[in-house]
Swiss-Prot record:
Keywords tagged on the record: Chloroplast, mRNA processing, Plastid, RNA-binding, tRNA processing
Subcellular localization, as worded in the UniProt entry: Plastid, Chloroplast
Protein name in the entry: Maturase K
One family name in Pfam for this protein: Intron_maturas2
Species classification: Eukaryota, Viridiplantae, Streptophyta, Embryophyta, Tracheophyta
Task of the protein: Usually encoded in the trnK tRNA gene intron. Probably assists in splicing its own and other chloroplast group II introns.
Similarity comment text for this entry: Belongs to the intron maturase 2 family. MatK subfamily.
Length: 505
């Protein structure tokens, strides 16, 4: 594999030296598919159904399949491709629609991946920035000093042609873009709009890598203006701002975007607009938060600027209510499964001056994170752990498993929820969710043995409960006193994805 990476990097260096960006020829290189497979592609897409190739044995090598694919690509004229082409209908169509998009997505990621690696070499704590909880530690440090917050939804739907035009600004390989256009034209209504939910059905499970590449490209372009604004403000060049850069997928075009957007933006807005010293931005998937210390009027200018920027540059119209501006002291916002906000904590300070003492009442701003109970119960209802009233019910589909397997499954869910929501400042909502899962586990066991919950709890005893306590709970108890453990927020830097039961949309 090192040889493949060396050969690939040598090819790209030659093309970079020639000041060309031709990625299309990589589709005809066998090592590209091996490299993409090694980096996490689903291996099943490299195997065409054996009845289509004339084989009776399902264990044939994938290298032969790739060679046949490359031969077909050489023979196929993509300028005249049609949805009615007999070579790509029936079983062959499935193979074409799976292998080509995944290979294309892997090739399109190559230039950005190499720039990403070179950028990460300068960061010694990159792993910490990958954690979702690092966002909250950043907000905890910054939001208590800010006044206003904007909840922003990245605009969609996206027209396919607009999306391709956006890609042309960063990918100058016309044959590759034409291949992508042919694929999208064949597998989707060209005049339709892609919404976040619709795109899941358009791009099948096998094509998720291509969809993620297109979606990340779209999101990056939508927030590219913020890269320019960050360059304009010297106050944003703090260590914490590295987290923003780490969560931007495509690094190599930052300088290019700054030059382009500077020329476009300075003609439409006065320069004083960018002099705001404290503007902070975080994003996860399609939801982003922008907070500032500026006035409500200036926040509205930010809102109108973003809406006009998306409309003029990308022909995207923000959804009604896509940007909400609220005062931090009076508003809490939903982000990554937490209900976050800034609340005033009253403090009484005793001041001693010689023989006189004074009691001073004051308030300190504190970043507050709460686990929203109703969205979590809604997730448990969808997963059939409880009803809409929060009353635990049995998980009937697990009733055929062994007792230890059932307990382990419920314990794993409870452990992950506790791990993710460890940053909550109030743990009573989390305790209620744990109780629902425990009783649901007991009811599932009672359903299996045709018994009662009381009899199951009496028979299993402590074994039924110990699975719902994590090892980290015991470790953290040595760090904090047990009286403070229920109120302390703990952020873990090993969480890189959200649990499926955590509502975050």
């Amino acid at each position: 594999m090192e040889k493949l990476q060396y050969e690939l990097q040598g090819y790209l260096e030659i093309e970079r030296y020639r000041k060309q960006r031709f990625l299309y020829p990589l589709l005809f290189r066998e090592y590209i598919y091996a490299l993409a497979h090694d980096h996490g592609l689903n291996s099943s897409i490299f195997y065409e159904p054996t009845e289509n190739l004339g084989y009776d044995n399902d264990n044939k090598s994938s290298s032969l399949i790739v060679k046949r694919l490359i031969t077909r690509l050489h023979q196929q004229n993509h300028l005249t491709i049609s949805v009615n082409d007999s070579r790509f209908v029936g079983p062959n169509r499935s193979f074409y629609s799976q292998t080509i998009p995944e290979g294309f997505a892997g090739i399109m990621e190559i230039p950005f991946s190499m720039r990403l690696v070179s950028s990460l070499e300068r960061l010694t704590k990159y792993q910490n920035f990958r954690s979702i909880h690092s966002i909250f530690s950043f907000l905890e440090d910054k939001l208590s000093h800010l006044y206003y917050v904007s909840d922003i939804l990245i605009p969609h739907p996206i027209h396919l042609e607009i999306l391709l035009q956006t890609l042309r600004t960063r990918i100058r390989d016309a044959p590759s873009l034409h291949l992508l256009r042919c694929f999208l034209h064949e597998h989707n209504n060209w005049n339709s709009l892609i919404t976040l939910n619709k795109s899941i059905s358009i791009f099948s499970k096998e094509n998720q890598r291509l969809f993620l590449f297109l979606y990340n490209s779209h999101v990056y372009e939508c927030e590219s203006v913020l890269v320019f604004l960050r360059k304009q403000s010297s106050h944003l060049r703090s260590i914490s701002s590295l987290a923003f850069l780490e969560r931007t997928h495509f690094y190599g075009k930052i300088k290019h975007l700054v030059v382009t957007l500077r020329n476009d933006s300075q003609r439409t807005l006065p320069l004083w607009f960018f002099k705001e010293p404290l503007m902070h931005y975080v994003r996860y998937q399609g939801k982003s938060i922008m907070a500032s210390r500026c006035t409500n009027l200036l926040m509205k200018k930010w809102k109108y600027y973003l809406v006009n920027f998306w409309q003029c540059h990308f022909h995207l119209w923000s959804q009604p209510g896509g940007i909400h501006i609220n005062e931090l002291s009076n508003h809490s916002f939903h982000f990554l499964g937490y209900l976050s906000g800034v609340r005033l904590t009253p403090w009484v300070i005793r001041s001693q001056m010689l023989e006189d003492s004074f009691m001073i009442d004051t308030a300190i701003k504190r970043f507050d994170t709460i686990v929203p109970i109703f969205p979590l119960i809604g997730s448990l209802v969808k997963a059939k752990f409880c009803n809409v009233s929060g009353y635990p019910i049995s998980k009937s589909v697990w009733a055929d498993s062994s007792d230890s397997d059932i307990i382990a499954r419920f314990g794993w869910i409870c452990t992950n929820l506790s791990h993710y929501h460890s940053g909550s400042s109030k743990k009573h909502s989390l305790c209620r969710i744990k109780n629902i899962l425990r009783l649901s586990c007991a009811r599932t066991l009672a359903r299996k043995h045709k018994s009662t919950v009381r009899a199951i709890c009496k028979r299993l005893g402590x074994k039924l409960l110990e699975e719902f306590f994590t090892e980290e709970h015991e470790i953290v108890s040595f760090i904090f006193r047990r009286t403070r453990l229920r109120s302390e927020r703990i952020w873990y830097l090993d969480i890189i994805r959200i649990n499926g039961l955590v509502p975050h949309s």
